[in-house]
Amino acid sequence: MLSGQAAIVGIGATDFSKNSGRSELRLAAEAVLDALADAGLSPTDVDGLTTFTMDTNTEIAVARAAGIGELTFFSKIHYGGGAACATVQHAAMAVATGVADVVVAYRAFNERSGMRFGQVQTRLTENADSTGVDNSFSYPHGLSTPAAQVAMIARRYMHLSGATSRDFGAVSVADRKHAANNPKAYFYGKPITIEDHQNSRWIAEPLRLLDCCQETDGAVAIVVTSAARARDLKQRPVVIEAAAQGCSPDQYTMVSYYRPELDGLPEMGLVGRQLWAQSGLTPADVQTAVLYDHFTPFTLIQLEELGFCGKGEAKDFIADGAIEVGGRLPINTHGGQLGEAYIHGMNGIAEGVRQLRGTSVNPVAGVEHVLVTAGTGVPTSGLILG
């Protein structure tokens, strides 16, 4: 079993901005070198790299740019933000099996000044592959942006659970409260109120502007090695207690509308069941969580799928500041993708590490285990760190 075999020993990042002024390759190299410095390692110690299929920087290009030599392991993982925790899982599997000694997971993009994921891309319906076929079912009906695609599920969830726009807003308020205290966050010093959320414009009903993650230029990198080697390095090792991927039946990318139920994220439920089984833990053992928050409704649904509360009960679970620092389950203490930066979930993994190191700007008392999730609405992944 993978649990306890590998550890995160370094985290690194660029600044988070709306216009980096650098190439995506330079961003990747900067983050990788920053993470290695944090770990007390050099580029020549690295023999593995892993990233997203959506990343424009190949492993060999990053290796050249960062001064990394021979690679015995390299991989790319599909499904956008769903790959985030899986990059760490693959790195952990590589070092646990002896395929590599030190693996760096990275994600870099100019997602605001360059390719913007929220724009309509009609070319996706023209691809002569399975992606083109899938998109041809949803695009003609106006479901052509991530916000519109999530709005369909959010509306059904509201109907069945009784959740309201104000419940979604509670996630945004909590994230921005945490970001306001984080000098690295784009929205540092800029908290919001629930009234601000309710007054923000519609993007795709029932999603308002403040239900949607920001767009960011930047990069994050994570260094993974064996638990044995980690004990001799610079930082307190953060052990990978569990790591999982999940794809549910009848799965699509953001448009899984043909299942018996439209108000859940069963792929995240599958990830959760694996995480609890691998780690031997339960939701009650987790002191803080980093839940992928590209759109607020999916944060509520994740709480249910992961077992923190029953189906349809997330609106009550999060009430009265329960997901803020000092509450029963603080989430996204860095500010999340709504408040800190949208780096496809990789910055959330880094925050999990900081909580366990005791270096988070919004520390949660007595942290022993942190749950982190990757992108939702797609085949996804998750981690428990300790």
UniProtKB/Swiss-Prot annotation:
It comes from Mycobacterium tuberculosis (strain ATCC 25618 / H37Rv). One of its GO terms (biological process) is cholesterol catabolic process. Involved in cholesterol side chain degradation. When associated with the ChsH1/ChsH2 hydratase, catalyzes the retroaldol cleavage of 17-hydroxy-3-oxo-4-pregnene-20-carboxyl-CoA (17-HOPC-CoA) produced by the hydratase, forming androst-4-ene-3,17-dione and propionyl-CoA. Homodimer. Interacts with the ChsH1/ChsH2 hydratase via the DUF35 C-terminal region of ChsH2 (ChsH2-DUF35). The ChsH1-ChsH2-Ltp2 protein complex is composed of two protomers that form a heterohexameric structure through the Ltp2 dimerization interface. The keyword tRNA processing does not apply. One of its GO terms (molecular function) is acyltransferase activity, transferring groups other than amino-acyl groups. It catalyses: 17-hydroxy-3-oxochol-4-en-22-oyl-CoA = androst-4-ene-3,17-dione + propanoyl-CoA. The active site is at 292 (proton acceptor), 342 (proton donor). This is 17-hydroxy-3-oxo-4-pregnene-20-carboxyl-CoA lyase. Keywords: Cholesterol metabolism, Lipid metabolism, Lyase, Steroid metabolism, Sterol metabolism.
